[in-house]
């Protein structure tokens, strides 16, 4: 637990995640259920970065919770790691409609 947590102050990553959750800087916010900022320790030595959230991630607001998440959990387990040991996020924080490829 960092000093910030002990005194109730948010870390820079927590502040960024709060901004992402209410972001309306592109059109994707109109079709999302929840933004998916990422999760895990900000000082994690291992980071997984996907392309964009899928339907399950959009519903739960968490990265890699669908089929890809199950596979990731199995892979992490095989090397004696857990989700809490790594940082997981996506390039896009909102699901593109109908899982289409992201546009610039």
What does each of the following model-derived ranges do?
Residues 2-104:
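A polyanion-binding, active-site-adjacent surface
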């Amino acid at each position: 637990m960092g000093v910030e947590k002990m005194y109730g102050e948010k870390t820079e990553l927590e502040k960024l995640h709060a901004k992402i959750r209410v972001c309306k800087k592109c059109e994707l916010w109109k079709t999302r259920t929840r933004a998916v900022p990422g999760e895990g320790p900000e000082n994690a030595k291992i980071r997984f970065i996907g392309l964009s959230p899928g339907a399950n991630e959009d519903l739960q607001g968490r990265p890699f919770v669908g089929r890809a998440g199950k596979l990731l959990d199995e892979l992490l387990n095989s090397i004696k790691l857990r989700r809490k040991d790594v940082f997981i996020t996506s390039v896009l924080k909102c699901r593109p409609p109908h899982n289409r490829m992201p546009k610039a």
